[in-house]
Amino acid sequence: MKSGVAQIKPSSGHDRRENLNSYQRNSSPEDRYEEQERSPRDRDYFDYSRSDYEHSRRGHSYDSSMESRNRDREKRRERERDTDRKRSRKSPSPGRRNPETSVTQSSPAQDEPATKKKKDELDPLLTRTGGAYIPPAKLRMMQEQITDKNSLAYQRMSWEALKKSINGLINKVNISNISIIIQELLQENIVRGRGLLSRSVLQAQSASPIFTHVYAALVAIINSKFPQIGELILKRLILNFRKGYRRNDKQLCLTASKFVAHLINQNVAHEVLCLEMLTLLLERPTDDSVEVAIGFLKECGLKLTQVSPRGINAIFGRLRNILHESEIDKRVQYMIEVMFAVRKDGFKDHPIILEGLDLVEEDDQFTHMLPLEDDYNPEDVLNVFKMDPNFMENEEKYKAIKKEILDEGDTDSNTDQDAGSSEEDEEEEEEEGEEDEEGQKVTIHDKTEINLVSFRRTIYLAIQSSLDFEECAHKLLKMEFPESQTKELCNMILDCCAQQRTYEKFFGLLAGRFCMLKKEYMESFEGIFKEQYDTIHRLETNKLRNVAKMFAHLLYTDSLPWSVLECIKLSEETTTSSSRIFVKIFFQELCEYMGLPKLNARLKDETLQPFFEGLLPRDNPRNTRFAINFFTSIGLGGLTDELREHLKNTPKVIVAQKPDVEQNKSSPSSSSSASSSSESDSSDSDSDSSDSSSESSSEESDSSSISSHSSASANDVRKKGHGKTRSKEVDKLIRNQQTNDRKQKERRQEHGHQETRTERERRSEKHRDQNSRDSNWRDPITKYTSDKDVPSERNNYSRVANDRDQEMHIDLENKHGDPKKKRGERRNSFSENEKHTHRNKDSENFRRKDRSKSREMNRRHSGSRSDEDRYQNGAERRWEKSSRYSEQSRESKKNQDRRREKSPAKQK
């Protein structure tokens, strides 16, 4: 005890208080109560209360407040006892000590608790959150210490590293670095961590919906390489949307539907899923469901308009009905009206894919057809670590896939090529040094056309960044490109013009300025015109129109010479549909610029006629007619006046060329043969006239007309012969227009006579067939035709045939007729001589009438043939012929009726 006192004595008051408090805490409740009874403070307090009690007994009334204080004190003591009992149950109280142990506890070494249970040290990798932060260097050191790569510890550490890297990369992605993030993400084993990747993407999108288009582009790229990852993300999105719809969680529905909309825009999800979601949201419309549907429709409305117009029309029809019902809030009604305005503007503020995020080709994308109502497994097991017995094998497989995707297998070959190329460069430098010493120059020919591509790109950017053609020409001239690129510059100007939707005058003015600056540019455009016309069938109609209008502008402004039209040859064989369209647009544009009179005057320019021979052909009447029809069909018939005159004079030229050809080919005896032929013609005409006069005495006037006709033909032959001797060239014959016109009129009259003769012969044959059936009916048309310069042999043949037909008809009547009728006919019939006399009289009367009518018809025919030059089509001539023939047929019918009335059978 003394030692204990001696040790406590030098301590301060603060130490004593701490020891006292610790002693009181460690003592049991009974010891504390005994100590309170022994303490002087408690005794004084007790005496004070007792004196108060005696004082109140002496003369004062009972104080109720004191009783309440005593009750509170007792309750406090009971409460302390209860708490002490509870503590004593949990742990044995250290207050009950033996006197022997009290001495030992007073020492500082014995004040500390005897034994403490040490907590088991937990592995930080096995905790739920991954434990404390482990620096990367320490983590790599821990992984290196593990020799077995298939062990649980190593797989756990690699899983934690995979999770952290995926989360970090997903949180860093944006439009500018998405390609870099994709490459870094593919370096990790995302097949093993596909659950982690899906969870990270969905969490990042729900936390920041404004970057949904970026996450959708990221998912689209991963889906093109690993479709199972895209399918897993889409399944979880559908489940999240259904969960939010059931819970009436508008925010969850908004984020999920927005992500689905952008996946539809990226062709990861099918548009049927979008229509199903919209139908579900608008089936029982509320304020929140309509708001979610409108937000969803804004994001993917343009895509739906392109791929499913009927579906989006049905959705907007449903929105219109909801708006008319007016059962929703005013704010939502305004949202619907705004949605209709957005649709009217063509979703211009909501494009399908933003610029810079269209990173996957349509052919490489894999679209998932996942309906809304199916049951899906979210595969939450993939979010947590699970030991893989084939860990290293799966890692090697993913490395092979990663090499295929990122082309990492070519790195070694590239290094070898770099080493080899460095050696080759050294050798080339040595060779160049030797050649330079010898004084020779080395030229390198680039066959890859990289310089050409960059040159065309520079020209295109200069053209697109210029406000007017003068600024553009100034920029292009400052570039100082070589002369070999002159034609390429002209080609680039033409290509830029052809690519426009409509023709812009900017390019015509620019090309015209270059043509006026240098002759080389003009020659380049001349060559380009010929090349374009030869390959015009390769261009589309829109490009063809722009090219034609640009060249028309160059010709109108005289920037190009009109000699370039030499390559155009208008004929049915040398043109195609594309070339005809080109020529049509080209000349219509020229006519619009210059006007038809100026254009016609330019085409009639004598100095340019050699270049227009193919455009306005005169070599062949068929080609001439084709050119006339072509220009007339495109509304430029005024350009073909000379061609029409040439086409009219073509028969005259051909007739005039025949004597020259005969004169060049024939021998000197050709003149004698020509004279003999003329004599034979005259003898034939004389024989024809003698035959015609031998028919009857009434045909003398006809024979005289035939003889006069033969004399006229002889005169024509003499005139032709005189023309041969007088002129040998075609130009001299064309100048004698009067003689040629007279000959042409005579030929037309002869041709008209021949046509009328052939027509009358054809009708006479038809009437003979009809008259052969009736013996008493006479054939007046044969008489009519016999008077019109028909040869005597044909008339004799027709008479013999007529007599034979009549005799056969009489024989048939004699065989099959009644004997009484035969006797009456014998009595009343005339003799054959009397019949012939009657026929001759009738024929003379009708011949006189027919002669007068034929002369009138010849006058009409000659007048009509003289006016025939005014016709431009053959249809009107045919119509006039048919009208003439109809008049003749009517007159012949009248004559037939008259003859029937005057016939002997009628008189009897």
Swiss-Prot record:
The modification Phosphoserine is found at S39, S61, S107, S786, S829. Residues 454-570 form the MI domain. This is Pre-mRNA-splicing factor CWC22 homolog. Its main location: nucleus. The keyword Isomerase does not apply. Residues 163-346 form the MIF4G domain. Belongs to the CWC22 family. GO terms for cellular component: nuclear speck; nucleus; spliceosomal complex; U2-type catalytic step 1 spliceosome; U2-type catalytic step 2 spliceosome; U2-type precatalytic spliceosome. Residues 1-130, 404-443, 654-908 are annotated as: Disordered. Component of the pre-catalytic spliceosome B and the catalytic spliceosome C complexes. Component of the minor spliceosome, which splices U12-type introns. Interacts with EIF4A3 and PRPF19 in an RNA-independent manner. Direct interaction with EIF4A3 is mediated by the MIF4G domain. Full interaction with EIF4A3 occurs only when EIF4A3 is not part of the EJC and prevents EIF4A3 binding to RNA. Residues 100-109 have a biased composition (Polar residues). It is found in: Nucleus; Nucleus speckle. GO terms for molecular function: RNA binding. PANTHER family: CELL CYCLE CONTROL PROTEIN CWF22-RELATED, PRE-MRNA-SPLICING FACTOR CWC22 HOMOLOG. It comes from Pongo abelii (Sumatran orangutan). Gene3D superfamilies: 1.25.40.180. It holds the Pfam family MIF4G. Residues 407-438 have a biased composition (Acidic residues). Disulfide bonds: none annotated. Residues 666-680, 703-714 have a biased composition (Low complexity). GO terms for biological process: mRNA splicing, via spliceosome. Required for pre-mRNA splicing as component of the spliceosome. As a component of the minor spliceosome, involved in the splicing of U12-type introns in pre-mRNAs. Promotes exon-junction complex (EJC) assembly. Hinders EIF4A3 from non-specifically binding RNA and escorts it to the splicing machinery to promote EJC assembly on mature mRNAs. Through its role in EJC assembly, required for nonsense-mediated mRNA decay. Keywords: mRNA processing, mRNA splicing, Nucleus, Phosphoprotein, Spliceosome. InterPro entries: ARM-type_fold, CWC22_splicing_factor, Initiation_fac_eIF4g_MI, MIF4G-like_typ-3. Residues 28-56, 66-85, 113-122, 726-792, 801-817, 826-908 have a biased composition (Basic and acidic residues).
